Design a protein with these regions (language model features):
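Recognition helix of helix-turn-helix/homeodomain-like DNA-binding domains
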Residues: 84-99, 107-109
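Conserved hydrophobic/aromatic packing and binding residues within compact polymer-binding modules
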Residues: 65, 79-80, 90-93
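A short, Lys/Arg-rich alpha-helix, primarily the initiator
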Residues: 29-72
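Short amphipathic recognition helices of helix-turn-helix/homeodomain-type DNA-binding modules
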Residues: 103-106, 110-142
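Alpha-helical residues within the helix-turn-helix
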Residues: 70, 81, 110
Length: 332
């Protein structure tokens, strides 16, 4: 592969990165149309779809509250104690013998740590209007939040970062992500681009992931934790889809040292034209959102897990800047 040929050249990681710039540029240009979609996502205003509509449901507010209580593995006695109400009253609410006030619905939802979208569903089931708005990211009232996300993404360069919605659909990226996706099928890079599908799909970057088995285990476990918290059926379907993907041809069997128990974090080790790059990721969310869209937005930032990865990405960025300066000089 091109990554192996580049990695075999003499010199330090930074030197190898500079030597590979022309090769990388050529490979990326071959997929300009597909990658332009990813690069274009660094504008949040057009990346988010319109607010979703609620489907009618016959479940009562008591049914929903009981489901959330059981999902949180709380007994009626424990929830009643934390909510400072009687167990009898909670039992009446769950059975439908008592209709909770708007304040009581919100009080119980807070104790159960129910997501904002589901809190709206609880209110509607109880006969009240939704409390939390769901605006598209293009809404002028979210301009400050948009700017904050764009600043975080841009400020993370030369390392890759992306913003995703609750279903892991990419809504924005920085410019460092595109070159890492040059091996993905253009069909998978058409909006909406799902980050998890892109990483594990046979036509995505799965064949480029060196530690595919460990990464797959990490992705599925993380997705399951989200499902346990949110009860999101779309995430459940996504998990089943990802779990059914075949092992990429040539994938190496997991090594004992790759066990998550032996690491501080599960890295993403990616085979690229620069050689094997290794990343660990962090997740950033809004601290006190009162908008459904913002409450479901997360930024995944990838950091270099070794000095070679850091040097390679810095070298690539330096050469891009140099090419830009030369191009501007030639145009004058």
């Amino acid at each position: 592969m091109a990554g192996n040929r580049c990695a075999a050249r003499p010199g330090g990681p930074g030197v190898r990165a500079r030597q590979c710039v022309e090769r990388i540029t050529s490979q990326v240009m071959d997929r300009r149309g597909a990658l332009a979609i990813i690069v274009g996502m660094n504008t949040l205003s057009s990346a988010q779809s319109a607010p979703s509509t609620r489907s009618a449901t016959s479940r009562t507010v008591g049914d929903l509250l009981r489901e959330w209580r059981q999902r949180r593995r709380m007994s009626q006695l424990l929830l009643a104690a934390e909510a400072d109400i009687s167990t009898r009253h909670l039992s009446f609410v769950e059975s439908g013998r008592a209709m909770p006030s708007r304040e009581m619905v919100m009080h119980l939802a807070e104790r159960l740590d129910v997501p904002l979208r589901a809190r709206n569903a609880l209110l509607v089931a109880a006969g009240y209007a939704p409390l939390f708005r769901e605006r598209p990211l293009s809404d002028p009232q979210l301009s400050a939040a948009r700017e904050a996300v764009e600043l975080v993404l841009k400020g993370h360069e030369p390392y890759p970062a992306l913003a995703v919605d609750r279903h892991w659909n990419i809504v924005a990226t920085n410019n460092a992500l595109g070159p890492l996706l040059s091996g993905a099928s253009p069909d998978l890079l058409k909006p909406p681009v799902n980050a998890l599908r892109l990483s594990l799909h046979p036509e995505g970057i799965a064949s480029s992931i060196v530690n595919w088995h460990a990464w797959r285990e990490h992705v599925l476990a993380r997705l399951q934790r989200q499902i346990d918290v949110s009860a999101d059926q779309t995430l459940s379907a996504l998990r089943d889809e990802l779990a059914a993907y075949p092992t990429p041809p040539g994938a190496q069997p997991p090594e004992p040292g790759e066990s998550p128990l032996n690491q501080i974090a599960v890295p993403l080790r990616l085979r690229t034209p620069l050689g094997v790059l290794s990343f660990f990721s962090t997740t950033t969310v809004f601290g006190t959102p009162v908008d459904v869209t913002l409450s479901e937005l997360a930024i995944e930032a990838f950091f270099p897990a070794d000095p070679q990865t850091a040097a390679a990405l810095h070298g690539l960025t330096d050469n891009r800047r140099s090419d830009g300066v030369h191009g501007a000089t030639a145009g004058t």
